């Protein structure tokens, strides 16, 4: 029998999946892993709703505003495309009736999973949009698909958290701490550096607790033993970064005793300039009574002593932190204690939230809830003090020559960051255009910049 079907000579078009990623850097890494797996299996990634065969929405459910943003994004994806898979923290949230919140608000979604559920997401994708073919080994780069610029990337070392802070519901959505195998983390870091990443941002819910869940089990990397522990991991990442002339930046660092072991790496020896003198430490408050209600470590005096000791060892250390103003039961005197702490600690970069009740958080049961206007007024007063402190510290950099990583180049010059500035949350350096061809720079370059001015948050300088 003659076959009447003739080949067009072109392979069938690959199915396309759209991706909407909301929330924190940890959620962004989840999205990157999903996209990486999709590309590995031959799917294409669509940048538009109408160009996609279905859409995956990675949600955030930490605070009420984030919940609403996620629900709105799901609704938009349903309206524009119609086929939507939902993943992320909001997927683990229940409504007042006890059923899934997303399914109750948007019953037409194809499926809902919780956070860090790449396998589950892929199973649902397969059931609604079969994968086109078995992938070639080199279809996706070893570093995976990233949503960040090529010169920096986030490295997530664990999932979940063992803390039970009264204002937070993350453990109920992401579970208890689960540390990634240390060799797996190191391999990902190496692949990222090989791909041209100049700055690796180490993230998790609690970076300092890395390895606690596996009792600091010893793994192996490049034929040598390596403990699944923060200190050893940071040292190994610093050594790897030094080979590629890159930076390692630490986020979500709780001030456990062994953090003291990290500071010398930042200040001296072969890792100086690679393990950045930068710590993102979420202190949240300074008054012991408020910290106890938050179910947080409650000794601000010891924290001040350690901050001072860290700076004695590493004078260039930048400390970023976040705080909550207007927590239930917070008195004016307790708030003043917080302001005094900010002045004395001289933190470089600070963020502050007016307390907002989060559905499911135990803090909702505390007495002494403050009116919205009081909470917001305290947040504003806090930021006024914090910005004065930050501006004074930034002003000291004028006249110095600093190493800057270029993030953007335009007609007016470049925009970059120093070791003291994490992307998107800290300040930037506006760099004058290079006058000589020998001094021209591009995105991802490290350049030496003489700082000529400061405005309280950002810096200006010339190559």
UniProtKB/Swiss-Prot annotation:
<dbReference type="InterPro" id="IPR013848">
    <property type="entry name" value="Methylthiotransferase_N"/>
</dbReference>
<dbReference type="InterPro" id="IPR005840">
    <property type="entry name" value="Ribosomal_uS12_MeSTrfase_RimO"/>
</dbReference>
<dbReference type="Pfam" id="PF04055">
    <property type="entry name" value="Radical_SAM"/>
</dbReference>
<dbReference type="InterPro" id="IPR007197">
    <property type="entry name" value="rSAM"/>
</dbReference>
<dbReference type="GO" id="GO:0005829">
    <property type="term" value="C:cytosol"/>
</dbReference>
<keyword id="KW-0004">4Fe-4S</keyword>
<dbReference type="Pfam" id="PF18693">
    <property type="entry name" value="TRAM_2"/>
</dbReference>
<protein>
    <recommendedName>
        <fullName>Ribosomal protein uS12 methylthiotransferase RimO</fullName>
        <ecNumber>2.8.4.4</ecNumber>
    </recommendedName>
</protein>
<dbReference type="InterPro" id="IPR006638">
    <property type="entry name" value="Elp3/MiaA/NifB-like_rSAM"/>
</dbReference>
<dbReference type="InterPro" id="IPR002792">
    <property type="entry name" value="TRAM_dom"/>
</dbReference>
<comment type="function">
    <text>Catalyzes the methylthiolation of an aspartic acid residue of ribosomal protein uS12.</text>
</comment>
<feature type="binding site">
    <location>
        <position position="161"/>
    </location>
    <ligand>
        <name>[4Fe-4S] cluster 2</name>
    </ligand>
</feature>
<dbReference type="InterPro" id="IPR012340">
    <property type="entry name" value="NA-bd_OB-fold"/>
</dbReference>
<keyword id="KW-0963">Cytoplasm</keyword>
<comment type="similarity">
    <text>Belongs to the methylthiotransferase family. RimO subfamily.</text>
</comment>
<dbReference type="InterPro" id="IPR023404">
    <property type="entry name" value="rSAM_horseshoe"/>
</dbReference>
<keyword id="KW-0479">Metal-binding</keyword>
<feature type="binding site">
    <location>
        <position position="24"/>
    </location>
    <ligand>
        <name>[4Fe-4S] cluster 1</name>
    </ligand>
</feature>
<dbReference type="GO" id="GO:0103039">
    <property type="term" value="F:protein methylthiotransferase activity"/>
</dbReference>
<dbReference type="GO" id="GO:0051539">
    <property type="term" value="F:4 iron, 4 sulfur cluster binding"/>
</dbReference>
<dbReference type="GO" id="GO:0006400">
    <property type="term" value="P:tRNA modification"/>
</dbReference>
<dbReference type="Pfam" id="PF00919">
    <property type="entry name" value="UPF0004"/>
</dbReference>
<dbReference type="InterPro" id="IPR020612">
    <property type="entry name" value="Methylthiotransferase_CS"/>
</dbReference>
<dbReference type="GO" id="GO:0046872">
    <property type="term" value="F:metal ion binding"/>
</dbReference>
<keyword id="KW-0949">S-adenosyl-L-methionine</keyword>
<feature type="binding site">
    <location>
        <position position="89"/>
    </location>
    <ligand>
        <name>[4Fe-4S] cluster 1</name>
    </ligand>
</feature>
<feature type="domain" description="Radical SAM core">
    <location>
        <begin position="147"/>
        <end position="392"/>
    </location>
</feature>
<dbReference type="InterPro" id="IPR038135">
    <property type="entry name" value="Methylthiotransferase_N_sf"/>
</dbReference>
<dbReference type="InterPro" id="IPR005839">
    <property type="entry name" value="Methylthiotransferase"/>
</dbReference>
<feature type="domain" description="TRAM">
    <location>
        <begin position="395"/>
        <end position="463"/>
    </location>
</feature>
<feature type="domain" description="MTTase N-terminal">
    <location>
        <begin position="15"/>
        <end position="130"/>
    </location>
</feature>
<feature type="binding site">
    <location>
        <position position="60"/>
    </location>
    <ligand>
        <name>[4Fe-4S] cluster 1</name>
    </ligand>
</feature>
<dbReference type="GO" id="GO:0035599">
    <property type="term" value="F:aspartic acid methylthiotransferase activity"/>
</dbReference>
<feature type="binding site">
    <location>
        <position position="165"/>
    </location>
    <ligand>
        <name>[4Fe-4S] cluster 2</name>
    </ligand>
</feature>
<keyword id="KW-0808">Transferase</keyword>
<keyword id="KW-0411">Iron-sulfur</keyword>
<feature type="binding site">
    <location>
        <position position="168"/>
    </location>
    <ligand>
        <name>[4Fe-4S] cluster 2</name>
    </ligand>
</feature>
<keyword id="KW-0408">Iron</keyword>
């Amino acid at each position: 029998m003659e076959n009447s079907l003739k080949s067009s000579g072109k392979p069938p078009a690959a199915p396309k999946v759209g991706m909407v990623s909301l929330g924190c850097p940890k959620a962004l890494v989840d999205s990157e892993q999903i996209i990486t797996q999709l590309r590995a299996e031959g799917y294409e990634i669509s940048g538009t709703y109408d160009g996609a065969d279905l859409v995956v929405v990675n949600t955030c459910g930490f605070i009420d505003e984030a919940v609403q943003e996620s629900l709105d994004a799901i609704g938009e994806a349903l309206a524009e495309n119609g086929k939507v898979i939902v993943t992320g923290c909001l997927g683990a949230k229940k409504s007042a009736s006890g059923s899934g919140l997303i399914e109750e608000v948007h019953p037409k979604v194809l499926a809902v999973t919780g956070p860090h559920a790449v396998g589950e997401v892929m199973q649902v994708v397969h059931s609604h949009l079969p994968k086109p073919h078995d992938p070639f080994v080199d279809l996706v780069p070893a570093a995976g698909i990233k949503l960040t610029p090529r010169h920096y990337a986030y490295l997530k070392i664990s999932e979940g958290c063992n803390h039970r802070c009264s204002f937070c519901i993350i453990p109920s959505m992401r579970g208890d701490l689960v540390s990634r195998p240390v060799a797996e983390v190191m391999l990902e870091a190496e692949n990222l550096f090989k791909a041209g990443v100049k700055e690796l941002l180490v993230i998790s819910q609690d970076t300092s607790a890395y390895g606690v869940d596996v009792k600091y089990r010893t793994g192996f990397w490049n034929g040598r033993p390596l403990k699944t522990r923060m200190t050893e991991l940071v040292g190994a990442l610093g050594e790897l970064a030094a080979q590629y002339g890159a930076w390692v930046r630490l986020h979500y660092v709780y001030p456990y005793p062994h953090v003291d072991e990290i500071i010398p790496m930042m200040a001296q020896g072969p890792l100086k300039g690679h393990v950045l003198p930068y710590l993102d430490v979420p202190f949240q408050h300074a008054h012991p009574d408020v910290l106890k209600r938050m179910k947080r470590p409650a000794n601000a005096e010891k924290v001040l002593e350690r901050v001072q000791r860290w700076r004695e060892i590493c004078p260039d250390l930048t400390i970023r932190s976040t705080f909550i103003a207007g927590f239930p039961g917070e008195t004016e005197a307790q708030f003043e204690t917080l302001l005094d702490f900010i002045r004395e600690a001289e933190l470089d970069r600070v963020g502050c939230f007016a307390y907002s009740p989060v559905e499911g958080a135990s803090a909702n049961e505390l007495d002494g809830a403050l009116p919205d206007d009081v909470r917001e007024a305290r947040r504003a007063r806090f930021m006024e003090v914090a910005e004065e402190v930050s501006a004074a510290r930034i002003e000291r950099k004028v006249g110095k020559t600093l190493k800057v990583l270029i993030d953007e180049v335009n007609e007016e010059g470049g925009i970059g960051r120093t070791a003291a500035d994490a992307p998107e949350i800290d300040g930037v350096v506006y760099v004058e255009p290079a006058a000589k061809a020998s001094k021209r720079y591009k995105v991802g370059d490290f350049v030496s910049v003489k700082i000529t001015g400061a405005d309280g948050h950002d810096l200006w300088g010339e190559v």
